[in-house]
Regions:
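Short beta-strand-to-loop capping motifs
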Residues: 91-95
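Right-hand nucleic-acid polymerase module
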Residues: 2-50, 55-74, 78, 96-206
Length: 206
């Protein structure tokens, strides 16, 4: 996704988004934007792993997002909801729908916007509330709740257990290990606060 995003496409999309449209039209500010964008691109495309890449693509895809969102609100008799973060597109609905029709529509919108993107059908999944649906690293389960899944819960529990065991044996953890554990706990707490609180309470007494 990032490796397909060129500066030319970025400028074309920014030209229809305020206030970038005014910056591009103004001969005194256009060079500043050009220089700023040059710092964002590597070998003509956005590099993977930099903070600016998802931020920039989220901005330039606003016109595309609006067009797709509005079209899917009434698509083949279905009210579908479109969401996207970077290259992760999610289309959801209350009832079953033909996902291949939606995929073809998304492809047609890429062509309409002359976007340098194509759907990756190997990573395209269709699921229902009865199954396990993973979206951006979290799972929407059959109980219609967001969860991080058993494997991650087991890993966090094992990390906390290891920390408690080392603490009780006077074997101090290093700064990096502590920050990693603290980050994982904070992440869990933001998604499953009740589970996180119960887990911490359990090990607090150990």
């Amino acid at each position: 996704f990032f490796g397909s995003t060129t500066k030319a496409f970025t400028l074309r999309m920014l030209s229809v988004i305020w206030p970038f449209s005014e910056i591009i039209e103004d001969s005194s500010t256009r060079p500043i934007l050009d220089r700023a964008l040059d710092l964002c691109f590597l070998d003509g495309v956005l590099p993977q792993g930099t903070p600016i890449s998802p931020m920039l693509t989220n901005i330039i895809m606003i016109p595309f997002d609006h067009a797709v969102f509005n079209s899917l609100r009434n698509f083949g008799g279905h009210h579908l909801v479109y969401t996207r973060y970077a290259d992760d597109l999610t289309i959801s609905g209350r009832y079953d729908f033909k996902w291949t029709d939606v995929a073809q529509f998304i492809e047609s919108m890429f062509r309409k916007f002359d976007a340098p993107y194509r759907l990756n059908y190997e990573k395209t999944h269709y699921g229902s509330c009865a199954g396990r649906n993973w979206i951006l690293g979290v799972m929407y389960n059959k109980d219609r709740k967001i969860t991080l899944g058993k494997k991650r819960k087991d890993a966090l529990r094992a990390s906390i257990c290891d920390y408690v065991r080392c603490r009780n044996a006077d074997r101090a953890w290093g700064y990096t290990e502590l920050k990693s554990l603290d980050g994982n706990i904070s992440y869990f707490n933001s998604i499953e606060p009740e589970y996180t609180a119960a887990l911490l309470e359990h090990y607090h007494t150990k």
